[in-house]
Amino acid sequence: MIHFTKMHGLGNDFMVVDGVTQNVFFSPEQIKRLADRNFGIGFDQLLLVEPPYDPDLDFHYRIFNADGGEVEQCGNGARCFARFVRNKGLTNKQKIRVSTSNGKITLRLERDGNVTVNMGIPVLEPGRIPFNAKKMEKTYLLQATNPDSTMQTFLFGAVSMGNPHCVLDVEDIEAADVEGIGALLTRHERFPKGVNVGFMQIINSGHIKLRVYERGAAETLACGTGACAAAVVGQLQGKLDNCVRVDLPGGTLTINWEGEGKPLWMTGPAEHVYDGQIQQ
């Protein structure tokens, strides 16, 4: 039997598995079955806690989307990861350092129950996002072919928070065609590894509303790295302050970023739902 915990960060839900004290392996097919909300456990991502590869770190953090594919980063998942390893007694530290497939992040458990994540320095160079562009811009232009073969032009900012994001400004977040445009852009050829697509409505310089179409998972109730990406793009374009409240369908995150070349900090909740076990 494999023990797991169901958790969520603002409704972005996860199956979290301890791979430190348990010997576990999940194939992409198994993850797809487990992620199914009718016939499985149901989740946006599976989070796997592994022993560290570096003696200076506490854990290794792996993330798998509902389609079975492994991805580089998940901000909401990182907060749940921190809460999980403390709740399960895998560490007694307030500050936890973990590696991912794309780098290292620091997690800090706050006294109010929230978790703050040092998401690292946002990557803006197109080739490292990765996004095919001749040079770095604050705003990019892209053309995409609609299902009816008509062409549509999009203006957006692009950034990697350990995973690729593009962020579009919208006037009305409720009216935004998140599913249609998200599906059109997420696998566009100019994003070699696909992209998460954010739709940002600016309320004022310290407050935005956001919906995100996640690569491999469609629209979710919240996307932590998407909130980070939106704050970065808005600040680079001169529209947002250093500290931004981000309202997502599942709740609110606070993003702090002092500007280009500086690390970004994300603060928000991480909730335990239930513990369970499955046969493997």
UniProtKB/Swiss-Prot annotation:
Function: Catalyzes the stereoinversion of LL-2,6-diaminopimelate (L,L-DAP) to meso-diaminopimelate (meso-DAP), a precursor of L-lysine and an essential component of the bacterial peptidoglycan.
Pfam families: DAP_epimerase
Listed InterPro entries: DAP_epimerase_AS, DAP_epimerase_DapF
Domain of life: Bacteria
Sites where the protein binds substrate: 12, 45, 65, 75-76, 163, 196, 214-215, 224-225
Keyword field contains Amino-acid biosynthesis: yes
GO CC terms: cytosol
GO biological process: lysine biosynthetic process via diaminopimelate
UniProt main location, coarse: cytoplasm
Encoding gene, per UniProt annotation: dapF
Catalytic residues as annotated in Swiss-Prot or TrEMBL: 74, 223
Name of the protein this chain belongs to: Diaminopimelate epimerase
Family listed: Belongs to the diaminopimelate epimerase family.
Enzyme Commission numbers on file: 5.1.1.7
Catalysed reactions, semicolon-separated: (2S,6S)-2,6-diaminopimelate = meso-2,6-diaminopimelate
Record's subunit section: Homodimer.
